[in-house]
C-alpha cells in the first residue's frame, strides 16, 4: 500500500503546484501595466492635502499611468486583485491613521509595485523595504538632488530612514543645518517598493519625486519644460500678448499659450482681432492649447452640449487659421467621466492645471492619460532652486506664467523668464499632436499644421478654410445663470416691497404726531 501511496502523493503535489503556478501566471498576465491604485487617508483640507492628491494624480497621468483614486476607509477587500500594476499609499494626515484592516492586509500580501508617501510607515513596510525609522525634531532641511539644492519648509517632527542597504536606489538627500549636518535619504527604491517621507507640490521636491516615481514604475525619461502663458482670454490685452510673444521669439524661447475662446459672436471684429493675435503666436513658433471653460450649474445631461461646444470652439478657431495642438483644463476634468470623454479626449495632448474651483458632472476618480499629458506648474515655485541648470525633469512639464494685464507686469514677466535658467522644450521638434473635431482632424508635427492630412500654412491675414460650419448651440450652462438672475431679481423686489411698506407706516406715524 505504501509503495502505491507515496508515488501517488508525489504526482498529486507536482500537479497541484503546477495548477498554482498556472494560476499565478494568469493573474500576472491580467495585470494592467498602465494602471495604479492611489489610496489616501484623508484630504486634510486644513493643510491643503487635497492639492497634493491633485498634483500626484496629474503627475501619474504625465508618466502615462491611469489612476484609480479611493479613500482608505472606503477601500473594499480584494480591490488590489483587480489587475493594478501598483498601489500608492498617500498619508496626508498622520492623526487620521489607516483604519481599514482589509486594505492593510491586501497591501501587505500584494506582490506588485508599492509606494508609501508620508508618515506612518508600519513595521511590515519597514521589513519589506529593509529599513528602520528615526524621528527628527525642529528642523529646516535642505534638499539636494545632483548639484541642485532648495530649502525645505520647517518641520516640527519627521520620520527619516536609517540602516538603508547599499544596493537600494536613493533619490535626493535631506541635510540638516546643525553643526553635525546629518544627511538622510529623501526617496528610496528597494526592488519594487518605494518610500517618500513627504510630498511637495512644487520646486525641487516635486522634481525629485517625479524622477523617483517614474523610475519605480519603469517610465524613465528626460524632458525639457514647456514655457506656457496661461489664462489668456479674448478679453486679454492683445497688445501686451503680442509684445510678449515677440519677446519670446527674439529671445529664442519656444512657448505655448493656454487660452479660452468663445462660441458666439465669432463674426465680430473683436474676435477677428483675437484670432489674428493667436496667428501671430503660431507664426512666431508658439503653440496654442484650448483652455476649458469654467463650469456653471451643469449636469450629466449636458454631455452632448459640452461636446458640441468644444467642436464649435475648435471649428471657429480653425476657420480663422488658429490650430490648437491640445486641450488644457484643471486636473479634476480627468477625474470626471463626462468632462474627460466629451472634452479632453478630443485631443491626444493634454495640459492639466492645478484645481481651483472643482465642479464635477459625473465624478468617477478614474483618471486616464493621453499620448502626452503636461503637468502644469506655476514657474514661480521653482525660483528658489539653486543651480537650476542641473535640474532634470522626468515627465512632460509646463512651467506657467499668468497672462500679464499691464506694462509693469509684462516687464516683471520678462525678467522672470530671463532669470529662469532652464533649457526650454521646442514644440516644432517633437510634437505629434492630433485633435478630432466634428468630421475634421487637426494635426501638428515637425512644426507644420495640417487639416485632414493636408498641410496648411498659417498667415497673419487669415484665409477662409473649408471646414464644417460650427453648429449653433446654446451657451453652455446658460440656464444656471438665468436661474441665478431670476432669484436675484425676486430677492430685490421683496426688499423694495418691504421698504415701501415701512416708509408708508413711518409716514403715517409721523403725520399722527402733529395731529395731536
What do these predicted regions represent?
Residues 474-497:
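Juxtamembrane/start-of-transmembrane alpha-helix segments at the extracytoplasmic/lumenal side
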Residues 200-205, 210-280:
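Active-site beta->alpha N-cap acidic-glycine motif
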Residues 57-83, 376-387:
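A short, well-structured beta->alpha microelement
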Residues 41, 81-126, 285:
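Short alpha-beta junction capping motif
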Residues 35-42, 115-125, 252-341, 347-348, ...:
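Metal-dependent polysaccharide deacetylase catalytic core of the NodB/CE4 family, i.e.
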Residues 345-382, 424-432:
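His/Asp/Glu-enriched short active-site or ligand-binding loop at hydrolase and phosphoryl-transfer sites
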Residues 224-235, 374-434:
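Catalytic grooves of carbohydrate-active enzymes
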Residues 34-35, 83-84, 112-113, 130-140, ...:
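A glycine-centered loop/beta-turn motif at secondary-structure junctions
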